[in-house]
Amino acid sequence: MENIDNAAAESAAAGYFRIALGVEYKGSRYRGWQRQEDGVPSVQQTLETALSKVAASPVSLHCAGRTDAGVHASGQVVHFDTRAVRSAKAWVMGANSHLPHDVSVTWAQEMPAHFHARFKACARRYRYVIYNDQIRPAHLGDQVTWNHRPLDIERMAEAAAYLVGTHDFSAFRAGQCQAKSPIKQIHHLRVTRHGKMIVLDIRASAFLHHMVRNIAGVLMTIGAGERPVAWAK
């Protein structure tokens, strides 16, 4: 954190402003948040291109949490440093005028130099929605996971309780995960049914690559009766 604070002080001394933005996006067309070297579309690159036009200079973004390919966001927070003097409204309206229909900036605010979207985040929250019916949905395909097997919500909720707290989530991370430690703390994991929809609401200090979708996969397997509840341990 000391290096980050020093960098923030240097940026402020050089006449830079730190701007935070609220962002929402539909991730279906993107290879996740992170900028891709091979030119494959990413949310980060799309936003940086739009903001650079508003700032009339290159913009480099830092986010609260990197989302995987196909993942949507409704409350992503990002920040960047710039010498460009713009009002909050100008950042929002200007960025949105250069963004595609599936990415939107919802608010902007100048922040103190020590603010950091990633390291000042208190927690990250995901909502994973399962469409549980024999017939696949026609209009929700890229916003839900379809599971045709009858899922027992009580078994899923019981299994979810094992995951709350601080644990080693190595079994739930992707092989290419770059996180230094598999130890993460889940603050809240609730499983509820709303008709054909089963919603997993999960809040944690941070997540590993593919951690949420792997948790969902384990809970669905248990809910289908293919594994015992204790398999989630």
At which residue positions do the language-model features occur?
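Structured-RNA-binding interfaces characteristic of tRNA pseudouridine synthases
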Residues: 1-233
